[in-house]
């Protein structure tokens, strides 16, 4: 299945891209996608799927739009 992935901030250096369509097998979860594109497992992040917060175990569907962003702090 094809998933559109947008990486925000310094995580794009780990993934090697900032915006790209990726091919994943059916049944891939949010966490499986994030790890497969090279984002380190120990890196805090926020993931959205089609504009809403996504749980790590949530299954993806053809055409989903996923955004991965580091967690920012400060003011």
Where are these regions (language model features)?
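Ubiquitin-like/PB1-type beta-grasp interaction modules and other compact soluble beta-rich domains
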Residues: 1-74
């Amino acid at each position: 299945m094809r998933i559109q992935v947008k990486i925000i901030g310094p995580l794009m250096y780990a993934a090697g891209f900032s915006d790209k369509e990726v091919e994943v097998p059916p049944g891939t979860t949010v966490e499986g996608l994030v790890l497969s594109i090279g984002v380190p497992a120990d890196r805090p992040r926020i993931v959205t799927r089609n504009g809403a917060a996504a749980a790590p175990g949530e299954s993806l569907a053809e055409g989903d739009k996923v955004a991965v962003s580091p967690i920012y702090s400060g003011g």
